[in-house]
């Protein structure tokens, strides 16, 4: 973390202690509406057997194929949040569009960290952070 500027220490501490922070209304309504339209269209074009196969986890589409999501990935207000907590060099690794059916079981987050042999894997500072945007009420 950079020491030469003001850091949102409260949010950073919350991230370390709880594992998450909530930042409401990061996206503009215009971008949010565009993403909602595109993701809704993508999810409605999936074959029924695809939806049946992933009934409990929901649909998971890679965000890598959708140009509109590049704007979301590079969204300046979101990157400013990271910078405000001292994460100055954010990079993008991967992204998913997840669509779950109402009343389906809740999901758990799981990621197999690829760098357990690196000493930084055991430091308090997170090695990876992700943004999760809810496009509809849950």
Language-model regions: role of each:
Residues 1-17, 23-124:
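Non-heme Fe(II)-dependent double-stranded beta-helix
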Residues 117-138:
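Short, conserved beta-strand element in jelly-roll/cupin
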